[in-house]
């Protein structure tokens, strides 16, 4: 029987240093950087409006389980700017302004290798920070992804935790019963995801 362990990423195997669970307080800074980088001459009110629109779609502010692609969110946020900057460039400048610093925890690689030695396939299921493109996030955690057999994110599967879709997708991918999967995470949302999917769960603090 194929054994599968699934890791959450943020707060479990890595973190963006100093960033809280909700990033809404950083949205204004991100949009300010877009304005400054491209010399758009956008007013303070327009920047604040863009930040507020992005805030309204933040799932930690207004609960949602369905994922929305980053490009759609940013197109809505800057609709009033009437600028001709490609949305991908806007997104890149936005996150440059936030100045993210990624740290992979010291134990992460050893833990992944331990499960592999024990015969497990190793997958991950992670919620992408609201508004962040999947490819951008993957670059931030590339050393981890290179060690993981299957990468699944809220952007790639279309649903955010605690929706069980991602875990069910992983079970189907490996052809295993969902009851035989172990999901490892750091917060109550992860535990609830496992409960709704009816698979096993461990808090990361209990195994490291």
Give the predicted meaning of each segment.
Residues 1-50:
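Active-site neighborhood of HAD-like aspartate-dependent phosphohydrolases
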């Amino acid at each position: 029987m194929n054994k599968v362990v699934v890791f959450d990423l943020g707060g479990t195997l890595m973190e963006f240093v100093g960033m809280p669970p909700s990033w809404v307080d950083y949205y204004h800074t991100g949009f300010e950087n877009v304005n400054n980088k491209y010399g758009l001459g956008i007013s303070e009110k327009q920047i604040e409006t863009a930040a507020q629109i992005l805030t309204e779609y933040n799932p930690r502010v207004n609960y949602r389980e369905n994922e929305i692609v980053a490009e759609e969110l940013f197109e809505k946020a800057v609709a009033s700017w009437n600028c001709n900057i490609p949305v991908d460039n806007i997104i890149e400048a936005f996150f440059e302004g936030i100045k993210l610093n990624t740290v992979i925890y010291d134990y992460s690689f050893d833990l992944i290798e331990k499960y592999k030695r024990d015969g497990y396939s190793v997958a991950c299921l992670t919620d992408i920070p609201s508004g962040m493109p999947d490819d951008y996030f993957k670059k931030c955690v590339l050393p981890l992804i290179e060690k993981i057999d299957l990468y699944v994110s809220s952007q790639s599967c279309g649903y955010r935790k605690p929706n069980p879709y991602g875990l069910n997708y992983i079970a189907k991918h490996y052809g295993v019963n969902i009851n035989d999967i172990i999901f490892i995470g750091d917060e109550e949302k992860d535990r609830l995801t496992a409960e709704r999917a009816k698979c096993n769960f461990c808090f990361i603090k209990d195994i490291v």
